Curated annotation (Swiss-Prot):
Alphabetical list of InterPro entries matching this protein: Mur-like_cat_sf, Mur_ligase_C, Mur_ligase_C_dom_sf, Mur_ligase_cen, MurD
EC number annotated for this UniProt entry: 6.3.2.9
Protein name: UDP-N-acetylmuramoylalanine--D-glutamate ligase
GO biological process, one term: peptidoglycan biosynthetic process
GO CC annotations on file: cytoplasm
Species assigned in the record: Streptococcus sanguinis (strain SK36)
Source taxon at top rank: Bacteria
UniProt main location, coarse: cytoplasm
GO molecular-function terms, A-Z: ATP binding; UDP-N-acetylmuramoylalanine-D-glutamate ligase activity
Similarity-based family: Belongs to the MurCDEF family.
Listed NCBIfam families: murD (TIGR01087)
Gene3D superfamilies: Mur ligase, C-terminal domain (3.90.190.20), Mur-like, catalytic domain (3.40.1190.10), NAD(P)-binding Rossmann-like Domain (3.40.50.720)
Catalytic class of the enzyme: ligase
């Protein structure tokens, strides 16, 4: 049995709040640590800090004073969104203070085995699929991590009979030391978050960290559609179980239109409850994990057939006058939009795209845009997206925001058409996160529905 860490009387600095920091602070306080929370937001605008102070936890807000680190902390638990070149983090590391993220903390305090899922795209859907299949098969799959349920919060009540099914971002994985999943999944890798990581190599290294402490008794599920996965398969101590839509592998693969695991037919592609080639990959990864956990084929098929998707991830919203609306606000990069478009007939799609300008062009998207009925373009990156539309020969309209875009797209639509929000860009030029952007699209749908 794993030894549970002892935090009693340990001086810990929690850097950054949001959901994970707040959860970590409460957990550490409950475990007897001497906790200080530091957050950049002013106290009067910081409900989380106010709540923690009322509970007797020390808070320092409105900035990150370096002198705070003179208090001889034994550990820093860093919000994953705070980069490692932050002055507080740099100083802590110089002072030899261990810096971890909240998922490492969750691992240290729980006996529950962990299934960790990471990747550039598809990780939320795959995480949700896995948790649902495990639970339906009699194993309690507890969703946690980057999916919106702080891992440390879920880990507090999890027993050794549960399975912590964690969605893990590259930001979280950079801060692991002892974190050890029983099964890990890397859905795919593509260049993203380079403003945080600095280079493709650093980003890939952060993702690869998921297998850092795995052994031959553990399983690493990799996407063999991508060459990097084949190349890296020999660089891990874990037992690799591949999945692929393009070739037969010793794992999960497509046999014609049949999702198959090591020769066992599981289900037809057409039976998956959500559309798109990316969801075939997500389903194959889920099948690999489920079979490794001993779940029967009928249960896997039933869950994946009934799977309705995840909010903001190619979510079917409904119809207005026989025009279907899909909310793929989580599409923050080109690959995600390519995957979304692959599930539809372009001639019926009115695509809403654009968002934060990170300086990248959209040439790779041009082949996928060809044949679209229309585009509605918005955001900082509009000029770059328009260049791609011009190259693809697609006409477009401008929009001021997502609500405006949804209304304009619907005005162009005919019965049988599809209005698809799949921006291929992050949301931060106009919205605080992709959820807020997606919620505005959902609200616009309700307006149009009347």
């Amino acid at each position: 049995m794993k030894k549970i860490a002892n935090f009693a009387n340990k001086k810990v600095l929690v850097l950054g709040l949001a959901k994970s920091g707040e959860s970590a602070a409460r957990l550490l306080d409950k475990l007897g640590a001497i906790v200080t929370v530091n957050d950049g937001k002013p106290f009067e605008e910081n409900p989380a800090a106010q709540s923690l102070l009322e509970e007797g936890i020390k808070v320092v807000t409105g900035g990150h004073p370096l002198e705070l680190l003179d208090e001889d902390f034994e550990l820093m638990v860093k919000n994953p969104g705070i980069p490692y070149d932050n002055a507080m983090v740099v100083r802590a590391l110089e002072k030899k203070i261990p810096v971890i993220t909240e998922v490492e903390l969750a691992y240290l305090i729980s006996e529950a085995p962990i299934i960790g899922i990471t990747g550039s795209n598809g990780k939320t859907t795959t995480t949700t699929m896995i948790a649902q299949v495990l639970t339906a098969g009699g194993q309690n799959g507890l969703l946690s991590g980057n999916i919106g349920f702080p891992a440390s919060q879920v880990a507090q009540t999890a027993s050794s009979k549960d399975m912590l099914v964690m969605e893990l971002s590259s930001f979280q994985l950079m801060g692991i030391e002892d974190f050890h999943p029983q099964i890990a999944v890397i859905t795919n890798l593509m260049p993203t978050h380079l403003d945080y990581h600095g280079s493709v190599e650093e980003y890939a290294a952060a993702k690869w960290n998921i297998q850092k402490n795995m052994t031959a008794d553990d399983y690493l599920v990799l996407n063999f559609n991508q060459d990097w996965a084949k190349e890296m398969a020999s660089q891990t101590q874990a037992t690799v179980v591949p999945f692929s839509t393009t070739e037969k592998v010793d794992g999960a693969y497509l046999e014609g239109d049949v999702l198959t695991f090591r020769g066992e037919a599981i289900m037809q592609v057409a039976e998956i409850g959500v559309p798109g080639s990316h969801n075939v990959e997500n389903a194959l990864a889920t099948i690999a994990v489920a079979k490794l956990r001993g779940i029967d084929n009928q249960t896997i098929k039933e869950v994946l057939s009934a799977f309705g998707g995840v909010k903001h991830r190619l979510q079917y919203v409904g119809q207005v006058n026989e025009v279907a609306f899909y909310n793929d606000s989580k599409s923050t990069n080109i690959l995600a939009t390519q995957k979304a478009l692959s599930g539809f007939d372009n001639s019926k799609v009115i695509l809403i795209a654009g968002g934060l300008d990170r300086g990248n062009e959209f040439d790779e998207l041009v082949p996928d845009l060809k044949g679209l009925k229309k585009m509605v373009i918005l955001g900082q990156s509009a000029a770059r997206v328009k260049r791609a539309a011009d190259q693809a020969g697609v006409s477009y309209l401008d929009a001021t925001d997502v609500r405006d875009a949804a209304h304009k797209a619907f005005a162009q639509a005919e019965p049988g058409d599809i209005v698809l929000l799949s921006p291929a860009n992050a949301s931060w030029d106009m919205y605080s996160n992709f959820e807020v952007r997606g919620d505005e699209f959902l609200a616009a749908f309700e307006e149009l529905k009347g």
